[in-house]
Amino acid sequence: MTAVQLIVGLGNPGPEYDQTRHNAGALFVERLAHAQGVSLVADRKYFGLVGKFSHQGKDVRLLIPTTYMNRSGQSVAALAGFFRIAPDAILVAHDELDMPPGVAKLKTGGGHGGHNGLRDIIAQLGNQNSFHRLRLGIGHPGHSSLVSGYVLGRAPRSEQELLDTSIDFALGVLPEMLAGDWTRAMQKLHSQKA
C-alpha cells in the first residue's frame, strides 16, 4: 500500500472557468485545502497552485495546475519530478462525463478515457498511468458534439449541489486514501449515494 504524497485537482485557470463542470477536480482540492487549513499559493516552478499538509508525519502535497487542462501534465510532472513522487503515490481528481452528478468513484490506473488532462499527465509521466484517480461525476450532455460547451459551462444549482455532495463523500474517505488503503476507500466511497 503506497501512501498518497500528491493530490492534484484538474481544471482550467482564470475566472471565466471558475465553477465550470471541467473544474470539478480543482474544486475538490480547494475544499480539501480548506478542510486542512492549507493555503494554496502560486508557484511558477510547478505551473500551479501548491500547498502541503502533514499526515502521520509525512508531507502530502496539493496541486491545482494553472496551465490549461490539456497541459496539466506539465505541472504534475514538474512537481512529482522535483519531489521524486512515483505515479502510484499520486491521486488526480477530475470531472467524469460517464457518471451522473453526485457520484464519486476511485480508480487506479487505466487510460485517459478521452479526458485531455489525464491524457497529458500520462504522456508527461513517461506513459506511466499507474496513478490513482478520483472521478467526480458531472453527467453527459447526450451527444459528443455538445461535450466541449457542456464541460466548459456552469452547472445549474441542483447539479452543483450534487457535485458538492460527492466531494463531501470523497473527503470522507481521505484517511483511507492517504494511507493507500484503496480497497477500503473504494468500498466506502462506492457505497455512497447522493
Curated annotation (Swiss-Prot):
CDD domains referenced in this protein's UniProt entry, alphabetically: PTH (cd00462)
The organism of origin for this protein: Pseudomonas aeruginosa (strain ATCC 15692 / DSM 22644 / CIP 104116 / JCM 14847 / LMG 12228 / 1C / PRS 101 / PAO1)
Any one Gene Ontology BP term: rescue of stalled ribosome
Top-level taxon: Bacteria
Known function: Hydrolyzes ribosome-free peptidyl-tRNAs (with 1 or more amino acids incorporated), which drop off the ribosome during protein synthesis, or as a result of ribosome stalling.
The keyword tRNA-binding is annotated on this UniProt entry: yes
Organism classification: Bacteria, Pseudomonadati, Pseudomonadota, Gammaproteobacteria, Pseudomonadales
Active site, UniProt feature: 22 (proton acceptor)
Record-marked site positions (Discriminates between blocked and unblocked aminoacyl-tRNA): 12
Chief site of localization: cytoplasm
Protein name per the record: Peptidyl-tRNA hydrolase
GN (gene name): pth
Its EC number(s): 3.1.1.29
NCBIfam families noted in UniProt: pth
Catalytic activity: an N-acyl-L-alpha-aminoacyl-tRNA + H2O = an N-acyl-L-amino acid + a tRNA + H(+)
Chain positions of site Stabilizes the basic form of H active site to accept a proton: 95
Record bears the keyword Nucleotidyltransferase: no
